[in-house]
Structure formats: C-alpha cells, structure tokens
C-alpha cells in the first residue's frame, strides 16, 4: 500500500515505514504529524479525487530541523557581463526528517 501526499509544495510517494525529509515544520522530535493533503492511495486499486477526500497519513518526527538537519549549501552566483557586477549568495534549507507510521483511507 502506498500513498501520494503533498507537503510543503512538493509531492511524495510514501508507504508505511518510509523515512523522508520534508520542509521544516517546527515540530519537536517524537511528535506526531498528520498530513491530510492526500492526492492518491493504492491499496490494490488506485483511488484519486473524491475517493481520498477523508484520507490521512500519520508520521512521527525522527529529527527536528533546528540546527542539525540542514541540507547541503546551494550557491547562487549572478554575473552581469561587462558591468563589473557580480553577486554570490548561499542558501541552506532546513528540513524535518519524518517516519510514516500509518496510512488511513
């Protein structure tokens, strides 16, 4: 059984026991997170739309995103030719690591 969920503007294909990195939620470790934005569920047959309107996915936070869980730095470099103008910026995304515990249809 798997489900396709939408969390933080991204879509993930998850099943029970999966561990994934989602955008920072502000939840502490071992707190429960309920995701109600379910796009599809496959339990032998694929259900989408109104059939999954009351479906939800429960997850538990493995590690919170404060300080430790930061993604690799992405460098943004902009150069304007012939203008002697350049800009270099870095960005590190904070994320929360969760484990999917239950998929309820």
UniProtKB/Swiss-Prot annotation:
Subunit composition and interactions: Part of the 50S ribosomal subunit. Contacts protein L20.
Q: Which terms does the record give in the GO molecular function aspect?
A: rRNA binding; structural constituent of ribosome
Q: Which UniProt keywords apply?
A: Ribonucleoprotein, Ribosomal protein, RNA-binding, rRNA-binding
> What is the designated name of this protein?
Large ribosomal subunit protein bL21
The answer, when asked if Ribosomal protein is one of the entry's keywords, is yes
A single Pfam family, by name?
A: Ribosomal_L21p
* Protein family per UniProt: Belongs to the bacterial ribosomal protein bL21 family.
Its biological purpose is as follows: This protein binds to 23S rRNA in the presence of protein L20.
Query: Please, one GO biological process term?
Result: translation
Listed InterPro entries? bL21-like (IPR028909), bL21-like_sf (IPR036164), Ribosomal_bL21 (IPR001787), Ribosomal_bL21_CS (IPR018258)
Q: Which organism is it from?
A: Aliarcobacter butzleri (strain RM4018)
């Amino acid at each position: 059984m798997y489900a396709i969920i939408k969390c933080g503007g991204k879509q993930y294909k998850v099943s029970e026991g999966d561990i994934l990195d989602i955008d920072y939620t502000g939840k502490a470790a071992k707190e429960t997170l309920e995701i109600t934005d379910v796009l599809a569920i496959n339990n032998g047959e694929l259900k989408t739309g109104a059939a999954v309107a009351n479906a939800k996915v429960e997850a538990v936070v493995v590690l919170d995103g404060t300080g430790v869980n930061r993604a690799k730095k992405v460098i943004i470099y902009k150069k304007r030719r012939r203008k002697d103008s350049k800009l270099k910026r870095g960005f590190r995304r904070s994320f929360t690591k969760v484990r999917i515990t239950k998929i309820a249809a």
